[in-house]
Amino acid sequence: MPKRTGDILMSSPLSKFRRKLNFDSPYTSRAAAPTVQGIKRRSWTYRPMYRKPRMYRMYRSPDVPFGCEGPCKVQSYEQRDDVKHTGVVRCVSDVTRGSGITHRVGKRFCIKSIYILGKIWMDENIKKQNHTNQVMFFLVRDRRPYGTSPMDFGQVFNMFDNEPSTATVKNDLRDRYQVMRKFHATVVGGPSGMKEQCLLKRFFKVNTHVVYNHQEQAKYENHTENALLLYMACTHASNPVYATLKIRIYFYDAVTN
């Protein structure tokens, strides 16, 4: 008689009970009776890839973007910006052409994800004033880059009463600029309830396929398709804030380079 495995449910038409032969805690799944389908679905989770069925080995999650090849490369940008009411912009897809782990091999690569880490803070004079200031962040994809530098915040976004919190992409630029992610952070000044700095820690999946020209330098003017831009603006008209950020992009080189 063949032996039964430990995680098989034994039940028969004549029996009025079901048993589960494993040594799990009785409090994990006490509410509902487990099914064979649920156990089979979880049984391959913590096994190595060569011991999983063929379906799990063939149809995997898209770790590497379509049309790209490994290894995963990393490029970091350390910057300190004076964020004003009129806004500031930084290009976060500047990658130099080369053979290193931080370089692109050819013209094409795909930015799979971006990691924004840092803080926004006020100086000694501004944090003593009673006010609340919010910094708006817009992660924008420029599908057709043009010129030597990115367009300013006021040129890209349409605002009511010059308020960055009401910023939307202008109608004639909606096919070129796409807001992929939008978030904000708040600082408060004053003698009571002061919050002079706010930490930032954001991770986004973007899957942006960037195309350069034949130049090697990491510049905005060398982009031909899909430049990734980070726009920042504060809501207070007279009190600026400072942003100390470390931005990391994780990208893969394209196969067709």
UniProtKB/Swiss-Prot annotation:
<protein>
    <recommendedName>
        <fullName>Capsid protein</fullName>
    </recommendedName>
</protein>
<feature type="short sequence motif" description="Bipartite nuclear localization signal">
    <location>
        <begin position="201"/>
        <end position="248"/>
    </location>
</feature>
<dbReference type="InterPro" id="IPR029053">
    <property type="entry name" value="Viral_coat"/>
</dbReference>
<comment type="similarity">
    <text>Belongs to the geminiviridae capsid protein family.</text>
</comment>
<keyword id="KW-0863">Zinc-finger</keyword>
<dbReference type="InterPro" id="IPR000263">
    <property type="entry name" value="GV_A/BR1_coat"/>
</dbReference>
<comment type="subunit">
    <text>Homomultimer. Binds to single-stranded and double-stranded viral DNA. Interacts (via nuclear localization signals) with host importin alpha-1a.</text>
</comment>
<keyword id="KW-1160">Virus entry into host cell</keyword>
<feature type="short sequence motif" description="Nuclear export signal">
    <location>
        <begin position="101"/>
        <end position="122"/>
    </location>
</feature>
<dbReference type="GO" id="GO:0042025">
    <property type="term" value="C:host cell nucleus"/>
</dbReference>
<dbReference type="GO" id="GO:0043657">
    <property type="term" value="C:host cell"/>
</dbReference>
<keyword id="KW-1140">T=1 icosahedral capsid protein</keyword>
<keyword id="KW-0167">Capsid protein</keyword>
<dbReference type="GO" id="GO:0046718">
    <property type="term" value="P:symbiont entry into host cell"/>
</dbReference>
<dbReference type="GO" id="GO:0075732">
    <property type="term" value="P:viral penetration into host nucleus"/>
</dbReference>
<keyword id="KW-1163">Viral penetration into host nucleus</keyword>
<feature type="zinc finger region">
    <location>
        <begin position="68"/>
        <end position="85"/>
    </location>
</feature>
<dbReference type="GO" id="GO:0003677">
    <property type="term" value="F:DNA binding"/>
</dbReference>
<keyword id="KW-0238">DNA-binding</keyword>
<keyword id="KW-0862">Zinc</keyword>
<dbReference type="GO" id="GO:0008270">
    <property type="term" value="F:zinc ion binding"/>
</dbReference>
<keyword id="KW-0946">Virion</keyword>
<feature type="short sequence motif" description="Nuclear localization signal">
    <location>
        <begin position="40"/>
        <end position="54"/>
    </location>
</feature>
<dbReference type="GO" id="GO:0005198">
    <property type="term" value="F:structural molecule activity"/>
</dbReference>
<keyword id="KW-0479">Metal-binding</keyword>
<dbReference type="InterPro" id="IPR000650">
    <property type="entry name" value="Gem_coat_AR1"/>
</dbReference>
<feature type="short sequence motif" description="Bipartite nuclear localization signal">
    <location>
        <begin position="3"/>
        <end position="20"/>
    </location>
</feature>
<dbReference type="GO" id="GO:0039615">
    <property type="term" value="C:T=1 icosahedral viral capsid"/>
</dbReference>
<comment type="function">
    <text>Encapsidates the viral genome into characteristic twinned ('geminate') particles. Binds the genomic viral ssDNA and shuttles it into and out of the cell nucleus. Plays a role in protection of the genome from degradation, virus acquisition and transmission by insect vectors, infectivity, and systemic movement. The CP of monopartite geminiviruses is absolutely essential for virus movement.</text>
</comment>
<dbReference type="Pfam" id="PF00844">
    <property type="entry name" value="Gemini_coat"/>
</dbReference>
<keyword id="KW-1048">Host nucleus</keyword>
